[in-house]
């Protein structure tokens, strides 16, 4: 009888775990580019708009707690492009029950801006900028397994202006 109770309890816990995985919140990502005309030799601003389900947050890019997973936007850039700066939004405080210090989080909707430098000798044509968005979605009770979402920006680059 004890063995049966143990098996039922173990099965119930695994079912809860599987159920939580199927309900894992997903960030909706919208990549845009601020400039209409993009020329070699200039800077361009990439924008990633992130929308999370209601009552969901992600840790900031600079969490206060060393044990949480920060939100991170990274790139594998083609030759001729350089990331000059990534600007994350200001975080908000989120206090969990029984925690002394609030967590630094990004809530429901936020944007990340990236200043990208284009080499002056970059060939004209379409350029694809691939990125990865790492985040861990959490609600007020638990954090879900971290996810990495692929994102990309496509831009038509014109030749550099000659002086």
What residue spans do the PLM features occupy?
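Bacterial N-terminal signal peptides
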Residues: 5-15
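N-terminal secretory signal peptides that target proteins for export/translocation
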Residues: 1-2
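Extracellular/lumen-exposed scaffold segments
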Residues: 19-163
């Amino acid at each position: 009888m004890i063995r049966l109770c143990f098996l039922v309890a173990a099965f119930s816990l695994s079912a809860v775990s599987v159920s939580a995985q199927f309900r894992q919140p997903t960030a909706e990502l919208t990549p845009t580019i601020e400039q209409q005309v993009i020329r070699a030799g200039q800077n361009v601003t990439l924008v990633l708009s992130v929308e999370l389900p209601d009552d969901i947050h992600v840790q900031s890019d600079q969490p206060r707690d060393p044990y949480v997973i920060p939100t991170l936007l990274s790139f594998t850039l083609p030759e001729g492009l350089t990331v000059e700066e990534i600007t994350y939004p200001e975080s908000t405080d989120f206090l969990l029950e029984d925690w002394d210090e609030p967590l630094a989080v990004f809530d429901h909707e936020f944007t990340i801006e990236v200043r990208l430098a284009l080499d002056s000798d970059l060939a004209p044509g379409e350029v694809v900028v691939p990125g990865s968005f790492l985040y861990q979605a959490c609600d007020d009770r638990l954090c879900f397994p971290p996810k990495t979402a692929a994102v990309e920006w496509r831009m038509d680059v014109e030749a550099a202006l000659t002086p």
